[in-house]
């Protein structure tokens, strides 16, 4: 799983050039409920966060959960538990159950295209 995360981060580095990178990792997948850890240089100014189900070749097949800042302003967030919108965020798509053995892509975005990042993970 770490190899997939590294590949995802390297891909984001190439795509965003000088934009700020949000490094996303996955912790604690107990009961198919992952916790996402977000890191960057300085504060993580998050605008939105989405989780997609993906095919084996990495193509998104549908959103399983997404959140967005309630007022459009970025929020400082370092941890997100799947299905629980942090303070200052609202669900744009209600959380669907995650399934063991299925591959997902989690994507964090800063406002106005200032940066972002993501991770590909499989629920164990």
Named regions from a protein language model:
Residues 55-81:
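Aromatic (tryptophan-biased) beta-strands that constitute blades/sheets of beta-rich domains
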Residues 100-109:
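Short, aromatic- and glycine-rich surface loops/edge beta-strands on solvent-exposed regions
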Residues 109-118:
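Short acidic/polar inter-strand loop motif in beta-rich domains
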């Amino acid at each position: 799983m770490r190899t997939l995360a590294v590949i995802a981060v390297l891909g984001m580095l190439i795509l965003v050039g000088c934009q700020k990178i949000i490094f996303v990792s996955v912790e604690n997948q107990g009961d198919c409920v992952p916790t996402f850890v977000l890191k960057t240089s300085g504060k993580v100014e998050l605008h939105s966060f989405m989780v997609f189900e993906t095919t084996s070749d990495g193509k998104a097949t549908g959103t399983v959960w997404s959140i967005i800042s309630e007022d459009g302003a970025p929020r400082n967030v370092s941890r997100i538990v799947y299905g629980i919108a942090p303070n200052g965020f609202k669900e744009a798509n209600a959380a669907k159950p995650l399934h063991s053995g299925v591959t997902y892509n989690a994507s964090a975005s800063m406002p106005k295209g200032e940066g972002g990042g993501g991770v590909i993970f499989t629920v164990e």
